[in-house]
Curated annotation (Swiss-Prot):
ATP-dependent RNA helicase involved in 40S ribosomal subunit biogenesis. Required for the processing and cleavage of 35S pre-rRNA at sites A0, A1, and A2, leading to mature 18S rRNA. It comes from Aspergillus terreus (strain NIH 2624 / FGSC A1156). One of its GO terms (biological process) is maturation of LSU-rRNA from tricistronic rRNA transcript (SSU-rRNA, 5.8S rRNA, LSU-rRNA). It catalyses: ATP + H2O = ADP + phosphate + H(+). This is ATP-dependent RNA helicase has1. It is found in: Nucleus, Nucleolus.
Amino acid sequence: MGSAQDQTKKRKRQKVSDGSKSSKSRVVEADDQRELTETTTKPKKQKTEDPPTDETPDAEDVEQTENGETAQDDAAKDAEAPLPSTMGLSLPTDAAPQKFDELNLSEPTMKAIRQMGFETMTEIQQRTIPPTLAGRDILGAAKTGSGKTLAFLIPAVEMLSALRFKPRNGTGVIIITPTRELALQIFGVAKELCEFHSQTYGIVIGGANRRAEAEKLNKGVNLLIATPGRLLDHLQNTQGFVYKNCKVLVLDEADRCLDVGFEAELRQIVKILPSEERQTLLFSATQTTKVEDLARISLKPGPLYINVDHRKEHATVDGVDQGYIICEADKRFLLLFTFLKKNLKKKIIIFFSSCNAVKYYADLLNYIDLPVLALHGKLKQQTRTQRFFEFCNATQGTLICTDVAARGLDIPAVDYIIQFDPPDEPKAYIHRVGRTARGTKGKIGRSIMLLQPSEVGFLNVLREARVPVVEFEFPQKKIIDIQSQLEKLIGQNYYLNQIQSAKDGYRAYLHAYASHSLRSVFNINKLDLVKVAKSFGFTTPPRVDITLGASMSKDKVQARRPYGSQNKSARFKRRA
């Protein structure tokens, strides 16, 4: 930064107006401003595919420009325009601001923030937004539910506005997230934040119509939210995708991206995107060796490390009562049924360990007049999206799901998290619990984990991970005993027994248990299979095969194990 006199001279030489009052103007260096204005030399056009002329852009994916022109009209006028370096931007870096209006943000952004109902920043927002506005690369560690979505979206939108991005400039911000639901969640927040800006925004995710996505990218999407696989596909194969002007790359939930197998895709994406003037923000709830390696190849040397958790006594978010109930396997479903019956007016999320268990229990609960929504990875994307937003908008109801919904999603006003099946590790527990009381002061959520007597060793694992849990009592005499009716229903109902197979759910539960990462605690040989089978509505355990293959951890050898109705001495012998 120069002296006040130098700054005055620069302002006299060049000023970039954003259409608002002159006091709100953004200042850039003179050389950069000359690049921003349209040059007399016509830039080389990038080869594109002509989108169908009869298709109108989706209002939610591609917004209109300030002058009422659509992104398609704007893109047709010219090829992508060169943009200045972000290094010339003079953005506010006031020390330790507490409220959004102390950041000197543009009026369209402030108007959107006020409309969203926010006034005071969370800690991650206080510590991240000012240095990000100043152009620093960020390596952030924050709990789920801490408010980091706005922490990276606000600077991203401000940058696009300050540089006056047009659709013809292509994509200036790319946000990568591990799951489709989280991408949709971020897209919803971006839509609200961009309401009073002229910049366009969009989303590309697996399971959606790829051709429609490509057409929107051809028209120009300034802010793009994406899942790694689909983004890499467009980077490599969509010729009209203008990404050379990408100024900001956000890697959200980076540890989760790596956990679910996107390491190779992320490395290729980072390599393809321009790096010289790119600002990168990497957020991860946990810091692992793989996350550090990804940070090394994506961030500039000397990034700002922001950790809002290290001073916290507990690893989970505040405002959540966390506890567990010791329950025999054959009482688990009866306890769940009783709990749901007594809390029909509450908003509840229940976690299971497998898709087949979710499918079975969803059909069972709906059949016995306990309405629930099911969310798991085997659903079509349109169905997943519809159910996710249906539950988000509901004031009461029950969602049963796998961990596909456990990471990063902001589901409003959840009263209870029920972990029907224990998580695979403390990290998964933390993200499940993060679905309730997300960044809201005064909101108390409750998390309840069901543990069998043989699983109490998991409590020591949680305590070592700084997760506070207490034992909740649920009197046995209050449990509604419908076991005989349940067994009769499963025995006689063809749909539940064969079509939505209780047997498939039972097999999937045993498979997940056998492949648990904490096998010293969750030992399948300690399970009482008769009691486990009763929780699925069987009078005797059905015979099922469990395949443990190479996709699991190294200490698991390939084997095929039969479980079910056989004599006790032979029950756990491997088949030759």
